[in-house]
Amino acid sequence: NRLSVPINEPDVFKLGSLTGFGETFAAKVMGKYLDKYPEKKVSIYMGESDDLLVQLANGRIQACIVDTYCPPEEYECHELFESETICICAPTHPLAGKTVDFKELNPYRLIFREEGSKSYLNLRSILHGYNQDIHNFASFVEVGTINTIHNLVIENVGLSFVYKFVVQKKLDRGVMSQIFINDFKNKTFINYVWMKNSFFAEKNREFLDICKHYLSSLGDLNL
């Protein structure tokens, strides 16, 4: 049990984050955190939610941003916001900006994270909820990172399902487009969590306060 921190240990805030959010939301909030606490040292570990919770339990990180349910008897959990899952494509894709039925996506190539990843399991769950499956699509590309998915979509290799918040800037710049699907709506809670009774609870709340302040500054922005 980690009941104390060695006196000579640097004051490092060790945060874990979902890969996509680590490059967008967490990076922005961390900048504001360091503006308020310039003496702090920071380490950010990025990965899938299930991996982050393992790292949290092992003590490699002291808090994390995840998109999964965390039992209250084990974790201190705070909802940050709901993130919408959308279908994205290149601006030159035949369906870019259009509203279609789900089955109209089937003639195209689907791009997704590797089988076994939480992203893959989430995608499969979403598709099954609309009587669809990965194998309904004409073909697919399975990749290892979120950035690779984004790059392949931009190159018009295929379409993908991602959190809107993660690609909002690319949508705003016009390097990606959204495909609107009739009767499709999927939102997921994004949570900031740490272990129950953690020694680092006070420091974790400092970052939580920055998160809340940043989110309030966004107003009613649809994440």
Which residues does each PLM region occupy?
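Short beta-strand-centered segments that line the small-molecule binding cleft or hinge
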Residues: K28, K32, D50-T85, C89, ...
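A late-sequence structural motif
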Residues: F25, T148, S177-L221
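N-terminal winged-helix
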Residues: N8-Y37, K41-V54, E202
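Alpha-helical "hinge/linker" immediately C-terminal to small N-terminal DNA-binding modules
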Residues: N1-I7, H213-S216
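Short beta-strand->loop
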Residues: E76-I86, R173-N186
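Secondary-structure junction motif
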Residues: R109-Q132, A201, L208, L218-G219
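Flexible hinge/capping segments at coil-to-helix
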Residues: I7, E74-I111, E115
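Hydrophobic hinge/microswitch elements
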Residues: E48-L53, A57-R60, V66-D67, Q132-Q178
